[in-house]
C-alpha cells in the first residue's frame, strides 16, 4: 500500500527468463503481456490518479526503466532509467460511449493486450476508463511479463493504493537519475569485462568439475543415480501430461474474455467441505466447466493437459522479474464427482511439486535466451504441451482505494502463449474472480462456454451446503443475451 517504504533493490540485469519474455513482445503469438482490470465504484480524481503513478515510478525504478540490449551479445541486457521517461505516455484515460458495462471494458482490454508495448520505453501502461454505468470507472493496468509475473506485480504496484478513500497527502519521492546507455555502449562494456568473465567462468567450471569428480569417486552410485533421476524428472516435467482436446487444437489471433465473481468465504467453505484448498476447488470448477462444454458439443474427454504456474518467490524477494515454474496436470475433466475431482487434482499437484527438475525451464533459459529468434519460436511452438493454463494470484485481503475510488473487483487477464485458454483466479477484498481468456478458434461458442463456466463453479459452491451460494456472472447474463455486470450492481 501507499504506506510502505522504498521497495527492495531490483537487479539491473535481465534474467534469462525475463529476456525470453522480452523477445516475445515482437511476435503476436508469443506476446506475454499481463493485465489487471480493476472495477471502481466511481471515477478517480485524475490529478491524484497521475500523482499515484508518478510517485510509484520514483519508488519502484522498474517503472521508469527500459531494456537496453547490446548490439552483440557480449553482456546481459540491462534495465536502465529512461532519460526520455514521460508519464503521459504510460498513464492515459479514455471515455467509452456509454453507459458501458464490464463487457465493453473487457473488449477494450483485448485491443490493448494485442497491441505491442513500445520496447524503447518502460514496458507498462495504465488506462483509466470513464463513462461506465452508474458513474463507475475501470483501470486497465498492462505490464509486460518481462517486467514481472503476477505475484510480483501485486507487490510492485502496491504503492498506488490507499487503505482509506481520502488519506492525507504524502511527500513526493526524489526523481531517479536517468541513464544514457546505448546498445553499443553496453556491447563495449561487455567486451571490456570479457577477460574477467572468461577467467571467472573457467574457474567456476573447473571448481564444479573437481567437486563433481570428488563426489563421483567417493559416492559413485549415488552420483550416477542422482543424475539419472534428475534426467527422468526432467522428461516427466517437460512431457505433455495428457492427450490434447480435439476441440481446443486450433489457434488464431482472435481472443475473448469472460469473467465470474464468487464470494471468497463461499469458495473457502466449499473447498473445505470437499477436503481441499481454494486452489483445488478452483481447478475442479474449471475442469467441471470444460467437461460440460465438451459434452455439450458431443466430444466427451476424460483428461486434457493443463499447466498451473507455481510461485517460487521467497519472503523478501524483490518484486521484479519472473520467479515461477509450471506444473503440468492431466486435468480430470471427465471425473463427474466434484469431490473426487478435487482429490485427483490435489494428488497430482503434490506429486508434481516434488519433482527434482520442476524448475528445468529456468535452468535451460540461459541457453534458450541467446538462440536466434526463428529457432527460438520454433522450439517454443513445439514444446507447448498444454491446452489450458490456470493461475491463482492472491492480492489484498481488505478494502483498497485508488485516488478516492474504491476497488470493487479485480480481474486478471493473462497471455495466451500457445495455449487455447488462460484462466486467472484473483482474490481481493473478500471476493474471488475467475477470468477466462480464450482463443476463439478453439472456443467457438461464446454463449455456451459462459453457461458452462457458471455451471461448473456452481457445482463446486453447492458443496458448501444449503442454501447453496451461486456464481455471479460478471461479463454476461444468465440467458447469454446481454452483458449486464450484475455481480457488482449492489456492491
From Swiss-Prot:
The entry's keywords: Acyltransferase, Glycerol metabolism, Lipid biosynthesis, Lipid metabolism, Transferase
A GO MF label: O-acyltransferase activity
Catalytic-site annotation from UniProt: 145
GO cellular component, as recorded: plasma membrane
Protein name: Putative diacyglycerol O-acyltransferase Rv2484c
PANTHER family: O-ACYLTRANSFERASE (WSD1-LIKE) FAMILY PROTEIN, WAX ESTER SYNTHASE_DIACYLGLYCEROL ACYLTRANSFERASE 4-RELATED
Gene Ontology BP term (one): response to hypoxia
Induction: Constitutively expressed at a low level, it is not further induced by hypoxia or nitric oxide exposure.
Pathway info: Glycerolipid metabolism; triacylglycerol biosynthesis
Lineage of the organism: Bacteria, Bacillati, Actinomycetota, Actinomycetes, Mycobacteriales
Catalytic activity: an acyl-CoA + a 1,2-diacyl-sn-glycerol = a triacyl-sn-glycerol + CoA
Stated role: Upon expression in E.coli functions very weakly as a triacylglycerol synthase, making triacylglycerol (TG) from diolein and long-chain fatty acyl-CoA. Has no wax synthase activity.
InterPro entries: Acyl_transf_WS/DGAT, CAT-like_dom_sf, O-acyltransferase_WSD1-like, O-acyltransferase_WSD1_C, O-acyltransferase_WSD1_N
Pfam annotation, one family: WS_DGAT_C
Family: Belongs to the long-chain O-acyltransferase family.
Keyword S-adenosyl-L-methionine assigned: no
EC assignment: 2.3.1.20
